[in-house]
Amino acid sequence: MAKVAKDLNPGVKKMSLGQLQSARGVACLGCKGTCSGFEPHSWRKICKSCKCSQEDHCLTSDLEDDRKIGRLLMDSKYSTLTARVKGGDGIRIYKRNRMIMTNPIATGKDPTFDTITYEWAPPGVTQKLGLQYMELIPKEKQPVTGTEGAFYRRRQLMHQLPIYDQDPSRCRGLLENELKLMEEFVKQYKSEALGVGEVALPGQGGLPKEEGKQQEKPEGAETTAATTNGSLSDPSKEVEYVCELCKGAAPPDSPVVYSDRAGYNKQWHPTCFVCAKCSEPLVDLIYFWKDGAPWCGRHYCESLRPRCSGCDEIIFAEDYQRVEDLAWHRKHFVCEGCEQLLSGRAYIVTKGQLLCPTCSKSKRS
């Protein structure tokens, strides 16, 4: 008989449950005031009150997000973007780059300042290049503190990079063999697919940086540039750089995004560095390389293994329920209305929602 794996980290599990309890009552951003407040479901990643996802309630904090990304990047070639937590037993935290812009405002005798804080900015670049990058991002998606863009980033961190896609202790009821499969799965994608985009001017991707800052070309200086096919070109001739996605021109004085998994002969406009599956911007430039394109973590994992439509976790069990292109753990194949188990019973799947005939009829009426 299969055994359920022991808690990998009871402290972490208790903390996660406690966080959900303390998040009770958090308003839903999707319902726009109609939700009475977050009410955690016992195993679904939704609010029992409004049925919206946890993402729509933005339940995480900066510290939780930084710990999650730190865990994702540790034991990978991007671990330099993390820092060890003092007394944290090997835990690493994401060294998230924030950018603060202070602009003077002329209002009478006493000078005042307008301060803008970006919750995230591309690492390893000068403030000038970082600001250029941000100005190319739609205003509603710029991660400025206290704005819609900052909430958008937090939702995307939860959606594109679910903690339960990388941390077995955040999954419910993994059997011992499933635990081993998941650990190998995570180890493999960190080695073969995980990447972090690099922001640079066209032709400067992959160049050495001094003290973590992207070097700017001195005025009047000539350098040997690489063409889009990677060969060296005559510096006296203007090099044309093309975006890998839209095939549009990339101006030489405008930042682009590079992927070391793709090779530095390819570049993307900042708004074109998106998931190949959902076309959403890749949050914090974190991507997973597959089939010659960047993917978000969620859709990369789903492309290799089924995801349970009930609990939203990746399925590592050999035996599970599948209906068309949807999948469920056997124990989660239950009606979304009355929660009765539907294995061996009549059911209806409409727009991805699994219902028993009674609840389906009630919903239609």
Swiss-Prot record:
The keyword Isomerase does not apply. GO terms for biological process: negative regulation of transcription by RNA polymerase II; positive regulation of calcineurin-NFAT signaling cascade; regulation of cardiac muscle hypertrophy. Pfam families: LIM (PF00412), PET (PF06297). The keyword Cytoplasm applies. SMART domains: LIM. Residues 208-220 have a biased composition (Basic and acidic residues). Keywords: Cytoplasm, LIM domain, Metal-binding, Nucleus, Phosphoprotein, Repeat, Repressor, Transcription, Transcription regulation, Zinc. Gene3D superfamilies: Cysteine Rich Protein. Residues 200-235 are annotated as: Disordered. Residues 99-206 form the PET domain. The modification Phosphoserine is found at residue 16. Expressed in the heart (at protein level). Expressed in many tissues with highest abundance in skeletal muscle. GO terms for cellular component: cytoplasm; nucleoplasm; nucleus. Residues 241-306, 307-365 form the LIM zinc-binding domain. One of its GO terms (molecular function) is transcription corepressor activity. Its main location: cytoplasm. It is found in: Cytoplasm; Nucleus. It comes from the Eukaryota. Transcriptional cofactor that restricts GATA6 function by inhibiting DNA-binding, resulting in repression of GATA6 transcriptional activation of downstream target genes. Represses GATA6-mediated trans activation of lung- and cardiac tissue-specific promoters. Inhibits DNA-binding by GATA4 and GATA1 to the cTNC promoter. Plays a critical role in the development of cardiac hypertrophy via activation of calcineurin/nuclear factor of activated T-cells signaling pathway. Interacts with GATA1 and GATA4. Interacts with beta-dystroglycan. Interacts with GATA6. The LIM zinc-binding domains and the Cys-rich region mediate interaction with GATA6. PANTHER family: LIM AND CYSTEINE-RICH DOMAINS PROTEIN 1, LIM DOMAIN-CONTAINING PROTEIN. This is LIM and cysteine-rich domains protein 1. The gene is LMCD1.
